[in-house]
Amino acid sequence: LTAAQIIYPCMQATDIFFLKADICQLGMDQRKVNMLAREYCDAIKRRNKPIILSHPMLMGLKEGQAKMSKSDPDSAIFMEDSEADVNLKIKKAYCPPGVVEANPVLDYLKHIIFARMGEFTVERSERDGGLIKYASYPELEADYVNGTLHPGDLKPA
């Protein structure tokens, strides 16, 4: 191991204590750092361990991006983005027809929309098949794979 591989996780865990965080929310890729902080609490007999909330990492919006990046604003949706900015980023997002793997639009639907709302509605003209209401992500994914649902209908929804 390099010095950085040893020191950097310790620095990340130290942030949790320096900030006096009761709850620490990080992506699943940071789970080991969170567990290191909790194990350190055991070692020093600290009674109040930080509560760890881990969540899935969202893909970047461009093709081939495993996760969003703050250094590439077009690859991520930020809390301060306007509705127009979000709509433009989703419109430009990588979303190949019928492909589920590495598809950020479907990833967002699965981990944000369905996790929070439980359903999703696609409004389209009668000529294009009319309104579709999805009660579950697997139902939407099946329609996407078989071509019933096209990216051009999915993205503006």
Model-derived features: where do they sit?
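A long, hydrophobic alpha-helical segment
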Residues: T14-M28, R38
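Conserved nucleotide- and phosphate/pyrophosphate-binding catalytic cores
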Residues: A13, R31-A157
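Short, surface-exposed recognition loops or helix-turn segments adjacent to catalytic cores
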Residues: L1-T2, I23-Q30, I51-H55
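N-terminal Rossmann-like or analogous alpha/beta NTP/dinucleotide-binding catalytic cores
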Residues: L1-M11, N34
